[in-house]
């Protein structure tokens, strides 16, 4: 939206994507080189083994390369390091550097990288490593960043909250339930503070 897509265009983009593919690390056969294709055709099942160190552990179930590629396609023309305040509509997004526990607000840089970092849900997507930072979804520190919008000059804040309510103990059964609850709890105080700054909710 910030770079000129209309609401109708964004709706169409969302509805026409193959989300099963985007939210996987599968590489299309057409993108593989000849030797990779031959390996695929030779074996019904393959299990990769490698010497892996602690530093190489990815930190998430999904590397997110396919969705990052989509972001790159959608932001064609904005691949250089740019000032997000100079976009057709000023833009910012929030991540957390888990190396320091600090909030990182992107006002500049590569748009696709900022988008990918701000959606790196811990345990689901691998963190984004950038300039000695290890970045995850900003929802862990600021899931309703009204303060960021105010600092950018917003006069009226219209907020929409799509997060789930906290679950009672008998509903916290799966790993996903527990991770989701932790993320909601981590940003709860800042959320309450920002909620009071909202004009329409």
What positions do the PLM features span?
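Patatin-like phospholipase
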Residues: 2-201
């Amino acid at each position: 939206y910030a770079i000129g897509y209309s609401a109708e265009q964004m709706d169409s983009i969302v509805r026409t994507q193959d989300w099963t593919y985007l939210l996987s690390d599968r590489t299309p056969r057409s993108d593989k080189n000849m030797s990779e294709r031959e390996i695929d055709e030779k074996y019904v099942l393959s299990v990769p083994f490698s010497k892996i160190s602690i530093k190489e552990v990815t930190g998430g179930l999904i590397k997110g390369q396919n969705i990052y590629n989509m972001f790159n396609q959608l932001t064609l023309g904005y691949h250089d390091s740019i000032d997000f305040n100079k976009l057709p509509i000023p833009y910012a997004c929030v991540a957390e550097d888990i190396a320091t526990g600090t909030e990182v607000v992107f006002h500049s840089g590569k748009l696709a990288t900022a988008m990918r970092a701000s959606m790196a849900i811990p345990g689901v997507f691998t963190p984004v490593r950038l300039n000695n930072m290890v970045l995850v979804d900003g929802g862990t520190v600021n899931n309703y960043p009204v303060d960021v919008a105010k600092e950018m000059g917003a006069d009226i804040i219209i907020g929409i909250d799509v997060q789930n309510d906290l679950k009672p103990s008998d509903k916290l059964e799966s790993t996903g339930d527990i991770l989701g609850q932790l993320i909601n709890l981590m940003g709860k105080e800042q959320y309450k503070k920002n909620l009071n700054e909202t004009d329409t909710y």
